[in-house]
């Protein structure tokens, strides 16, 4: 910070000055607006793609789940506003072996194919061990709610590098999805 020392949190730093009266009016309105931290938002890191797979929570294998409870979303699934822009090909040859989903032709109850499958037989605590959120009624599985997610890794060659998507209740995700 230019005006404060290291003991002042960045969020509380003062601005040096505004450029004009219009900017000052905008800054006054922004200052009066509630802060994001006041919304009480919560975060789920999802399954760790390395350690949780080794621990037996899920395994690699192509499938077309019939329930969102059996879906583990990966980054390539996500496109702008949808958790099903692509799905892995049955061959699972490499990390780019995915095909686009025809959004106009898919049925209303469509669930994308996945490359990771829950292994509830090897890990009966699969559902209980998924991340929890704090609620008034106590801890609740984070995948019980609609969530906004985005890819951690996205191509920076285009003008859109943030791919926010709405994830439906039931679906899990791996840690490269935030």
Language model feature labels by segment:
Residues 1-178:
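Polybasic, glycine- and aromatic-enriched phosphate-binding surface used to engage nucleic acids
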């Amino acid at each position: 910070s230019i005006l404060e020392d290291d003991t002042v949190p960045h969020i509380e730093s003062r601005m040096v000055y505004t450029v004009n009266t219009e900017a000052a009016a905008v800054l006054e309105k922004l200052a009066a607006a509630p802060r994001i931290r006041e919304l009480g938002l919560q975060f789920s890191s999802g399954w760790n793609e390395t350690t949780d797979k080794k621990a037996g929570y899920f395994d690699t294998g192509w499938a077309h789940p019939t329930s969102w409870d059996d879906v583990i979303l990966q980054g390539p699934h996500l496109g702008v506003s949808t958790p099903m822009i692509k799905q892995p090909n049955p061959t699972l040859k490499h990390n780019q072996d995915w095909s686009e989903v025809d959004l106009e032709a898919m049925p209303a109850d469509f669930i994308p194919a996945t490359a990771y499958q829950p292994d509830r037989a090897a890990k009966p605590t699969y559902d209980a061990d998924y991340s929890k959120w704090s609620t008034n009624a106590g801890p609740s599985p984070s995948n019980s709610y609609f969530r906004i997610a985005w890819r951690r890794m996205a191509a920076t060659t285009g003008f859109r590098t943030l791919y926010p998507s709405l994830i439906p209740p039931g679906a899990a995700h791996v840690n490269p999805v935030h």
